[in-house]
Regions:
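C-terminal secondary-structure termini that scaffold catalytic or DNA-interacting sites
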Residues: 1-3, 372-380
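N-terminal core-binding DNA-recognition domain of tyrosine recombinases/integrases
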Residues: 35-53, 62-148, 182
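Short, charged phosphate-coordinating catalytic segments
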Residues: 125-129, 198-225
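Basic, Lys/Arg- and aromatic-enriched nucleic-acid-binding interface segment
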Residues: 173-205, 338
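Conserved tyrosine-mediated DNA breakage-rejoining catalytic core shared by Y-recombinases
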Residues: 210-254
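Short, polar N-cap/turn motifs at the start of nucleic acid-interacting alpha helices
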Residues: 216-218, 307, 330-358, 363, ...
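Active-site/catalytic core of tyrosine-dependent DNA strand-transfer enzymes
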Residues: 248-308, 322-325
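Short, basic (Lys/Arg/His-rich) helix/loop patches that form interaction surfaces
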Residues: 295-344
């Protein structure tokens, strides 16, 4: 069966180190050249896919498809829409080997990213046609309407791949603070601190994993009355769009304590490693703590606590709480635009992504306000 691996920093095309580039190998450990050529195009050429996390997402989708082709005796370059439809239908009726739960429709559509590979192969004359067709469909109202919808001349219709399934985006769910406490009670000091960073700043797990020790500001001469929050610029973000987060001073102080105590012990356990020395959060054996590991730690704690939640739900909790707070602030600062402010804080490119939190507030305002009051003491 095919194997998926990733390059290290020793991989230096054109003299530049490129760790994290996917590499697909066959059972004899030979390069599967069409797939590897596409991965190199994504990583080195295409300007909109500059993130290793994006490369991994595409690679894992193609890897799953390649294994399906091998298991069924399908030639990757001879499949038609019937085979791709069968692959989709298997996910619609089956469960994930990883989670044991049914596949979310968004996951199924994400797996169909493999079709971008076929489009690329057609452009380079590797195959004659893509194994799917496109058709016009009416765009659903699951997403909040764009602020520029009055300029849309499409009549509410888009051309889409006919193999993708209808997906209604669910409302984000804020975690009640009681559930968060139960989860945190199952965690060690470092992991509780990471949860606090997510709750109090809205940072994603990859952004927390990407925090560097040098980014942690000194607070010796700072008073909480003067500067209750400290801005920190994030460089390792989704879509490589730098933004600011605003952790409270007390959180910075607790993180400093972790650096001097638990992190110092972990660092002594590591071999000399510049990545470990620069990363803020480390594993017990002194390696940088990765985003996937952060998510797994939280999921395992949720299971032990009997809570249904994901690490990303912490970001939803922050977003809903912050929007409720900003809306209250407009009574004192009328010129404040809560949605645009929240969009900037969260780093959303599309305002409609932020607007979904308005609907969340309408359905779960009490829980969100309680969470905000407990976290910040900001609400009366």
């Amino acid at each position: 069966m095919a194997e998926l691996v990733f390059s290290t920093s020793s991989f230096c095309p054109f003299g530049l180190a490129n760790p994290g580039v996917p590499i697909l190998l066959d059972a004899q450990m030979r390069l599967i050249e069409p797939a590897c050529a596409w991965f190199l195009h994504l990583a080195l050429v295409q300007g909109r896919t500059r993130s290793p996390a994006t490369w991994r997402t595409y690679a894992e989708a193609l890897y799953d498809w390649w294994q399906t082709c091998e298991a069924n005796g399908w030639g990757w370059d001879r499949v038609g829409y019937e085979e791709v439809a069968a692959y989709r239908n298997r996910m619609l009726s089956g469960t994930s080997d990883l989670t044991g739960r049914p596949y979310a429709r968004s996951t199924i559509n994400g797996r169909l990213r493999i079709l971008a590979f076929y489009g690329w192969c057609v452009q380079r004359d590797m195959i004659n046609a893509v194994p799917f067709t496109s058709g016009e469909v009416a765009v659903g109202r699951a997403r909040a309407p764009s602020m520029l919808r009055h300029l849309d001349a499409s009549g509410g219709r888009q051309k889409v791949n006919e193999l993708t399934v209808r997906h209604t985006r669910p409302l984000p769910r804020a975690l009640p603070i009681g559930e968060v406490r139960r989860v945190m009670a199952q965690m060690g000091a470092r992991d509780r601190l990471i949860v606090e960073w997510a709750l109090m700043t809205g940072a994603r797990r990859m952004e927390i994993a990407g925090l560097k020790l040098a980014q942690l500001p000194a607070t010796d001469c700072v008073r909480s009355e003067d500067e209750p929050v400290i801005p920190i610029r994030l460089e390792s973000t989704k879509g490589a769009k730098p933004r600011q987060i605003y952790p409270p001073l007390a959180l910075i102080d607790r993180t400093r304590a972790y650096v001097h105590e638990e992190r110092a012990i972990a660092l002594r356990s590591s071999r000399t490693n510049s990545d470990a020395e620069s990363a803020l959060f480390l594993t017990e054996d002194g390696r940088p703590l990765g985003a996937c590991r952060i998510g797994m730690i939280f999921s395992e704690a949720c299971k032990r606590a009997g809570v249904a939640g994901t690490f990303h739900a912490l970001r939803h909790t922050f977003a809903g709480a912050m929007l409720a707070f900003l809306q209250r602030q407009t009574q004192r600062v009328p010129e404040l635009n809560p949605l645009l402010t929240l969009q900037t804080i969260l780093g959303h490119s599309d305002p409609s992504t932020t607007m979904i939190y308005l609907r969340m507030l309408a359905t779960d305002l009490t829980a969100i306000e309680n969470a905000l009051g407990d976290l910040y003491g900001a609400l009366a």
